[in-house]
Amino acid sequence: MKISGIFNVLLAVAVGVLAVNLYNRESAENKGGQTAIENIMTRTSIRSYTDKAVDAATLETLLRAGMAAPTAKNQQPWDFMVVRDRALLQSLADSLPYAKMTAGAPLAIVVCGNLQKSLPRVSASSWIMDTSAATENILLAAHSLGLGAVWTGVHPYPERIKAVRTVLGIPSHIVPLCVIPVGYPAETPAPKDKWKPENVHYNSWGVHTEQ
């Protein structure tokens, strides 16, 4: 085979490999985007769980997801309490009006704001935004891993904050935002369609269609 022929063959192979790589990369990117959106749209609150345990590696993934949340000035004003003890889970369920399902969960994650980490020059309440973002990350991560979870509110209710602090021995500079029971779903409720165009305003209040 002439040198020019060999060169043409090699060039054709190289172009083919490049095309395949680009296609695979584009497919992966599209799949990733679709997976993220699908995960958001199909997540729903799960309040009933099987007896299957959540292993340590899966738990760490949830906590890493929480800590990957956006945070003002990178304060990271959060702490996370993991509760597996059955007596403590029962006590949380007994103490909080909307967290009864915690008694049947393999574990709960208590998302807390740390007032000593929250910088007053940013905002005395910026921890609320940061820990809320962390909570949503945990909920989405749980759903993506085949787990079920639900956000049960603690802050800003003084009696609930006091109850959680008492059960878990939490100091006064730590404010529990919420308790997230986590486990493998024993129910499959359909996600609610919450899309309402009337809640969107374009350029001026009350304009619900983009011109």
Walk through the language-model features, giving the residues of each:
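Acidic, surface-exposed loops and disordered segments
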Residues: 2-211
